């Protein structure tokens, strides 16, 4: 899902960067009111786990890749704003040090994985979590990956409207990957709720 440099149009680059700056401002304003050593430790742990998982990539047609995201898990464990921050840190490190995702595409990558994946997973889990941890965790993980992948496809299509292939490919592949991520998210949340339920922010 990491979009490299040279793929997006200038309009998509600018619009996603503007959106990212707005979300980042709100996130830092919210986090400054609740930040603690406990939250810092959890954020660092989730960021490290997500970083490791995202480094396993499979290339797909259309100029991008397929990989685990971890957005739903980040949002559920940390809350949406700290979850966003953890994902943004991961994406910055990947782009600046490992060149995984381009700097010009950082806005788009962050909107997809740090905003859409985190917030959609968090909201859906909050709606379903009281009924079944497994159902809520699975559907949150699946939806977060599918929406992030589909939006990535939209950004690629807007940058090259001649071909709809990237949109279709990204949506279909991430619908499939979402099944695996949903299972991992559900398993992780079930384990955490059993061993240390107090650390979950939902």
Regions found by a protein language model. Name each.
Residues 9-15, 107-115, 176-180:
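Membrane-interface loop-to-helix entry segments
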Residues 111-152:
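Short helix-perturbing small/polar motifs within transmembrane alpha-helices
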Residues 14-15, 40-45, 69, 84-88, ...:
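Hydrophobic alpha-helical transmembrane segments
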